[in-house]
Every structure is written in structure tokens, then in C-alpha cells.
């Protein structure tokens, strides 16, 4: 099938913003003006077309990123028809995984900012993510109709807080209740949108006299910025020649694609003003799939060999699965971005990460929550496949005869965990299946069974993330669940070496008795033990057993029972029932009885000898220490460091981010002090800081902490 839209006229872009900047409303207006959505959905009524999960509509925040295809010929229908693949991304810090994964497959972005709040906390996080993936972007300053709206203030903040070169393409005519339209600095005309047609119609007019001077100054800055794109243009500009409109657009486009500048538009999505002109900016300034560097990958058999794929229908097929959604009607939907080649429904492709072939059933093009079945997808397309069995987020799907593994997405480790159990026994199996499916959809959500407590532990990116998971269990899978406070995985060990313990288990009361006698020595495992080629392989589960029996004082057949008794005892330590680690036990002496000795008797004797010896060897409780990295604007650095110290954290040093916009604080903090940290850090820094943490090591817990844990235990 021939291409209906040349690839140069594709625009794959995301709509990014801080929570409440009006991103979903902006997306809705895009769908309305591009003719895809006949009735505008309002977030205020919980009816937005793009927010398609019930919870999103209730909470008024966007959780899942919905991919939508739309078409645009320009506000005045003067441009050739372009195909938009739009991804709406969430702005809440608990869902940064959604933003990351959509950025990975996009070519450009529209950054929505609030004209009142300006560069808000989450804007900085999202901006840093966009920098990481080198995503060219334009900005839309929304809510110009709101009290306190100030376009110039936001332009200044982009420079001050984000280090961006903001280039206004428009100026607002009025603000707050008096916001009437915009001045187009390219055409040097005023634009007013017609309210009766919900902004579908508009008219050009002369710039209001009181804005003429400001418009000329802003245009001069815009033209100067464009001229810096090449020496040729700069010479022309400095020589006093006028630059043509097409030259200015092309030059600004070059600089936007190089992420050197951020062109700025303004309006009020709610009042149907400005979104239309911003869409023209998407066509004029954001990249097509052929404007971005070829996608990188590696050879399936040798990951040191780099490969690339061109955005071309004739190249071998390659695509990245970037999201999986469980759909109530068709099951698992795998969203994928095609980087090269073509794919037809019914084709077999290779999942090169898993080394498995997958048959593509139906291919669906998504419009928010509605879908249309299509026969094929081409380079640059974003679509969803039905019926893939082994594909998870971040996997590459490619031609069987031309394998490649595309650069994978990195997902942060979960930072908060809690125990969850079904309210009724009958829901146990259902809950297991449901959690498995949710974990497949969302790589930042993990499920595991705690071997020590038998509890199901769910882990995610924050309290809200896990709240929504529990909520989805109820809504989508009808599983009612109770959630508990998470437990810290403490451990127990000893600090004294060569502690002797002698225990005799003897019961002789007529008939066959029981007799087992062991003498053991307890010591901590040393670095030398771990380096010893003979001993190191025998260290299992951080426990080392050494049989030093000579002369047959304990027959050989009972030695395994002695070890078994010890290994069973260390799974639940004598202090507070946590696993024992880093202990070496040497069996040095004992005795036996010809008739009454048995495996069970020696197992009991070794277990009791261990418990008694452990108590004498100065036992300590160990707590997990997490390596924490916090990225925070400098204004909050003192508060954040103070809080780290209050949490018994040890600062390891600090640094600044590459662009100098934020501080990076590294610290070691006990896990027990980290619960609720995501929420605390958010309120401390107005949501502007982010953190990651990973397990680093265990170390002895302070006496007061150990006593509190043992009381509980």
C-alpha cells in the first residue's frame, strides 16, 4: 500500500507538563481542531477524551499516556496535510516512568506551562528527562485568561530556572479576563479567534498600537536568533537585508532541532485561543522522523557491535515496544514505535531481546480510547498490536532475517514497598494474576513474595503509584485488598570470634531414647574466608559450616544432620527472628550413643548449641543502608541536607548538574528512615527535587533502633 502521508510530514510529539498546567485540555483542543474529536472533553467534568482510565477522570490527573493519531493542514489550511502521532504524558512525579518511556519514542515535544505558575516543580524534572533524550521542543504558555497570567515572566523563568534560550513567536494581546488573542511575530499581525465557532474561525488584523513597539522588539530578537543559525543568514541580517518568512522558519527550525532554542507560543486552551497557532508551530519547527538521528542498536550476538536503522520504509523492519495496556475488550495491547521498514497484520517478527518469534495479530491505530484496525504500519508510525505473548516494555520487535536490539529504556528501581493481602481467601489466586498483569504493563511496579513473612510485597515509585495499583485491583479485577505498612528486611549477626558452645540432647526414659552431643565454635566470616579458594565455595546464604571432627567422635552419617540443624536455625535468628548472616560455625567435638543417636537428635543438638553460642557471641541487629541520590534546586539544598541528617543519613558529597540548575546530594541512609521520603521530599521542595535509591550494604543498627525492633519482633 502506498504511503498516504510522506514521512517528512510526520510529527511524533509528546505533550509534557507539570500537573495542572492544562496539558490534557490542550491535548483535547488539538483533537478537536484536527477534526478527530467532535465534542470537546473537559477535565473539569471528568470527561476528557484522552484521560481514559476511570481513576484519571476522578483524580483529574493523567496517568496512562494515550497515543493518538490526527491530521493538520495549518490554521488557515495553507500547509500540506501533516500526520500527528501525539502522546499525552502525565506530570505527576510518581509517573515519571510514563514520561521517560514516551520521550524515548518521540521525536519532539510541546512543553505546556501555566501562565500563572510558570516553571513549576515537575516542569524541571520533565525538562531534565527531555534533555536526557535530546528531545527538541517548543513551549505553549497556557491559561493566559487566568488571574495573575504573565507571559514575559514565564519566558524569563525558562531562562533562569531551566537554562533555556526562550524565543517568543507571539505576544499575548491582553491577559487575564482581558486576554483577546495573540500577535504573530512572523507575519506581524494580530490574531483573534472567533468564540462562537469554539476557535475554529479566526481573523488577522493590525497589531494594537500599544503593542507595536513591544512586537517590533520581540520580532527583532526572533530574527536575530534565526540569523545565528548560519553565517550566510548572519551576513544578510547584519547587512540590513530583510529575512524572508520561510528563511526565518527554516533557521529557527534548524536551531530547535539542535535543542539550542525553545520557541514560545501562548494562549488559553480552555478559551479555545492559541492552540491552533501552536499546531502550526509543530509543523514548522518540530522534527519529522527523518530529521532526528538514525535510531541506534546493537548486534544480537555481540552487544559491542553498534548498528543503526534509517527511517525508511525500504529498510528492514525495526520497532520498540514502549507500553503495554490491558484492554477490557481485546486483552493486552502492545504500543510500539516503528523506526524502519513496514509491518503487515499477520506478519511474524522477532523479539530480539527475548530471542522469541511473535505473530502480529491485529494492528490498531489509537485515537485516545477509540481504535481503528489498520492493515499495515510504516516507518515513523506509532500503533498498537494485539496478541503478543512474550513482549514486555522496552523490547525490540524486528524483522526475523535482520535482527537488531534497539537501545533499551532504563527504568528506575521502585522506592517504596508495602504488604498487600486479599480481603478474602478466594481472591488470593485472582490477586496474583492481577498483580502479574499490572507488573507486565508497568516496569516500575514490582511484585514479590516475602519468603520470611509469606506476604505479597508490592513496590513502586511512590505512595500515589501504589494507591492507584490497589485501586485498579478493585476496579479492573474485582479484588478487594488490605495494605499494610512495609517492613524493613533486618538481619542478625555476631561480633565475637571463637565462641564455644556445648550442647547435649539426651532423652532416655525406657525404650529407644534420643542422644546427640555437639561442641561448636562460632565466629564472624572474615574477608580472608571469602578469599580462601577452599572455603569460599562452601559459603552459602552468608553462612559457612566447617566439619573439624577427627577420630569418629561423631559418625560421618550424622554430620549432614548437624549442618541441617544449623541452616534451619539461621533462617530465623534468636534476636528478633530475622535471618542470620556472616556467621562461620566449626564443629569441633561431640559424642554419640550406639542405640539412641539419630539424625533428629543431632539436628536438635546443633540447633540448641547455635542459639546458646549466638547469645554469648555479642549478637547485633543489622539494618539495610541505601545509597541515595537526591537532585534538588540549590535553594532547597540546606533543608534537604538537614533532613538527610535527621534520618541518620551520612552525606557522601554533593555536586551540581551539568547545566548548573540543580544540586546532586549523595548520601547513605538506613532504609528504615526512608519510608514516606518521597512525600516528605516533595513537600520540602515543592515537588522540585527527585531521588533514586538502591541497596548498598548492611551495618549494625544503633541500640535504640535494635531494641525497638526486638520489642516488635
UniProtKB/Swiss-Prot annotation:
Q: Which residues form the tr-type G domain?
A: 8-290
Sorted alphabetically, the keyword list is: Cytoplasm, Elongation factor, GTP-binding, Nucleotide-binding, Protein biosynthesis
Similarity comment: family membership? Belongs to the TRAFAC class translation factor GTPase superfamily. Classic translation factor GTPase family. EF-G/EF-2 subfamily.
Q: Where is it located?
A: Cytoplasm
Please state the gene responsible for encoding this protein.
fusA
User: What biological-process terms (Gene Ontology) are attached?
Assistant: ribosome disassembly
GO CC annotation terms, alphabetical: cytoplasm
In this chain, GTP is annotated as bound at: 17-24, 88-92, 142-145
Role according to the record: Catalyzes the GTP-dependent ribosomal translocation step during translation elongation. During this step, the ribosome changes from the pre-translocational (PRE) to the post-translocational (POST) state as the newly formed A-site-bound peptidyl-tRNA and P-site-bound deacylated tRNA move to the P and E sites, respectively. Catalyzes the coordinated movement of the two tRNA molecules, the mRNA and conformational changes in the ribosome.
Q: Which Pfam families match?
A: EFG_C, EFG_III, EFG_IV, GTP_EFTU, GTP_EFTU_D2
Q: InterPro entries in the record, alphabetically?
A: EFG_II, EFG_III, EFG_III/V, EFG_IV, EFG_V, EFG_V-like, EFTu-like_2, G_TR_CS
GO terms for MF: GTP binding; GTPase activity; guanosine tetraphosphate binding; translation elongation factor activity
List the coiled-coil residues. Answer: none
Identification of the protein by name: Elongation factor G
What stretches pass through the bilayer? none
